[in-house]
Structures are given as structure tokens and as C-alpha cells.
Amino acid sequence: MEFLVNGASVYDESGVMVSFEESEDNIIENFRSDDLLRELIRENRIFIEDFSSTNGFESGDYSLEALFMRLDDAIKRVGAKRIVLDKVDNLFSHFEKKAIIRSELLQLIEWLNSRGLTSVFTTGENPYGGAAHGLEEYVSDCVIHLKHRYKDHIGTRYMTIKKYRGSEHGLNEYPMLINSKGLSLFPITSLRLDYTVSRRIVSSGIPELDNILGGGFYQWSSVLISGTSGTGKTSFVAKFAYEACERGERCLLFANEEPADQIIRNMASVGIDLEKFSSHNLLIHSERPTTLGLEAHLTAMQDLVREFEPDHVIIDPISSLTEAGFGVKDLFVRFTDFLKNRKITSILTYLTEGGSPLTTTEIHLSSLIDTWVILQQVEKGGYYANILRVLKSRGLKHSKKPVEFKLTSKGIKILGGE
């Protein structure tokens, strides 16, 4: 349906939906969240031809002439350039001989092609994972396979291009998300390393930290702030977000463990008034990755980035993504590449478990990170002091000297910064 709706609304190509399973009323009801479909039907740019209750093709000498007559009328009615035949396997369900099915399919495709139509067929699946009759794939120029897989009781949809004549298409499985805004795909391979880099430096929001970093962070770079629980990781990224919004820049904060109101309340205790920008420039989106599954979660994040168009993206924390296990690094590489290609600075926090080395992450992110700031607590004279050090900052002359910092009601205070 998205093929038809976008065709009519974006490319000015009217279309026909031919349904061999669902009634017209059911189709419209199933897409009731999309008012655009109803509008396009009213404007005579999309027409639904309902064959769901037709049994005239199922007896006597089989002929497609009656089908062609109805299709021809529907095509002319809207001046269609696109056509979808939904559950076309139902049309041939009473045939057992594959030779007849193949012949009729070819006749149908040739008839549609002769009218200059781009046609999409959908079909069910046989027990072996192929198309229902096992022949649809052979007579089609492009074959797209959809599947639904479960891991740890969480379902994720995937799309695979099994065949596309004349095209160097991808061969991998592409995670797919369907929501009220349509269908979204998450790229299965990293984007090419040809994105534009910036030489502009943006402030961390803390002048003393900027001095340690050699001026701040490079715009459009990826920054990691890691540390054990209670070291102030969220406070550092919240301060960055506050100062970015003060400059009129847009900031999108993905909170994976806390609701937005709780973050705003907690940050107020360290002198960071995020509520000031909550109605503009700053968007805090709270959702646990386990709600959808990692692939679907990152796809939803990708969609929100496109919609909000931020200058900076914060993910707090990314360590919650590691619960997805195998493949998480590959998925995250794609997401960070997606941000860099859109010229977005990314600030990530990572919770280091007690006893784990401070200079490693469970998903081995070091190669993806341009600047890495480590926060830790060290026993000092009967109390625990918060210590900050910069592990690396590519392209900037930074200090590696550890410095102490404090979280106060007036903000983050770095002691002895250069």
C-alpha cells in the first residue's frame, strides 16, 4: 500500500490495488491511521478493485478475460501507472498443475506490461519458505521476501531481496519497522567512509573541560563518556545539551533507562534547567531497547532523527543496547555512520560495570569513537573523589592528565583543569 500511496502523493503516479483476500472496507479500515489513503481514493488517484468474494474464475474453462476486463476498467478510471495484486496466489489456488499456473502468471504479467504498468504482486509462503506455488519467483523481475523472527520473545521483521534482474542489489537481511508513518528499513551494511568532516569545534558546555580537550569536540564527531554508576555521565551530556540549545541548536536525547520528566527533575539538582528548552530545540525520547528489539529500536531512532532534524544526538546510555548480544556492534556502526552522514554530532554514555576495565566496552566501540572521556570514582583521604580523564580525542591537542570534578547545585565544577 505504501508503494501506491507514495506513488500517487509523491511521484504523481495513480495506482490500483487489486485484492484477492480482503474486502475494500477492510483495507481502508486497516489503514485508517493514514488519512492520505482516504483522500487519494476520494481524489480518484487510487482505486481498490475488490476480488475477495469473487468466485467466477474458479469453475469451467479457466480464462483471465473477465479479470482483464475489470482491471482495464480500473486502470482507465484513475489513469494508473502502478498496480498491486494482493495475495495473487489465491487467484490460482484451485490449480494443481504448475505448468498451467506458470502460463497464466506469464499471461497476466505480459498483459500488465503491455499497458506500461509497474506491477507488484504479493503471495503467501509455502512450507519450504518460498512463494506459495513455487513459480511466482521465476516469472518476476524482482523478488522481495519478508519474514518475522523472534528472539527472547521479541519479534522483528526482516526484508531480503532474493532477486532483482539487472541490478547489483544487496543480499542481506534488512531489519524492518512498520508503524503509523509507514515502513522503514535499517541499512544492513555501513555507509561508505566518504562523509564530510568538519573543522569547527563545538563546546562541551563546560569551559574547563573544553580547555582539557583542546577547545571542545569536533562538530559531527562521535563522543563517548563512560564510567561507573554515579559518576555523573548523564549530567555531562545534559550540560552539553543545555548549552547547545542556548546557542539555538537542536538536540535529541534518547533516554534508554529514565523517563523524560525524571531526567529534567534530576538535572535541575545540579543546576541544569532542561525544562527551559523542552518545548523547543530539545526533545527527550524515553524508551527501553527491549520494548521493540534492537533492530526495530534503532530503526525507530533513525526515523525520529529524520523527523526532528537535530544538530546533536545523545544516547544515554548505549550500554543498555548490549543486552541484544550478537551483532550489536555492527548495528551500532551503521547508526553512527547514519548520524555522521547527516552531519550530526553524537554524544554517547556507557555504564562501566564494577570490576570491568575502564578503557573497554562490551561492544568494542573504541574504533567508532573520536573523543573518549572516562569518569571514575577514586578513594582519596577518606572519601571518594570523582576523576575525569580524556582517553583520546582525534585531531585535537588534548591533555591526558586526570582531574577532579564535583557535581554541585550550580553545575559541574572541574578542579585543576588546564
Predicted segment positions?
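Conserved nucleotide-binding/hydrolysis micro-motifs of P-loop NTPases
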Residues: 21-25, 33, 52-56, 89-91, ...
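Hydrophobic/aromatic beta-strand patches that form the interior of the parallel beta-sheet core
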Residues: 16-18, 47-49, 120, 144, ...
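Conserved inter-motif catalytic segment of the P-loop NTP-binding fold
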Residues: 11-93, 249-330
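Short beta-alpha junctions and helix-cap segments that line functional grooves
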Residues: 3, 32, 130-134, 146-148, ...
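P-loop NTPase motor core
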Residues: 61-138, 143, 293-372, 376, ...
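Short glycine-/polar-rich loops that comprise or flank the Walker A/P-loop
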Residues: 11-14, 43-44, 116-117, 139-142, ...
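The Walker A/P-loop phosphate-binding site
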Residues: 1-29, 187-264, 268-270
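Conserved P-loop NTPase
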Residues: 53, 69, 73-78, 148-207, ...
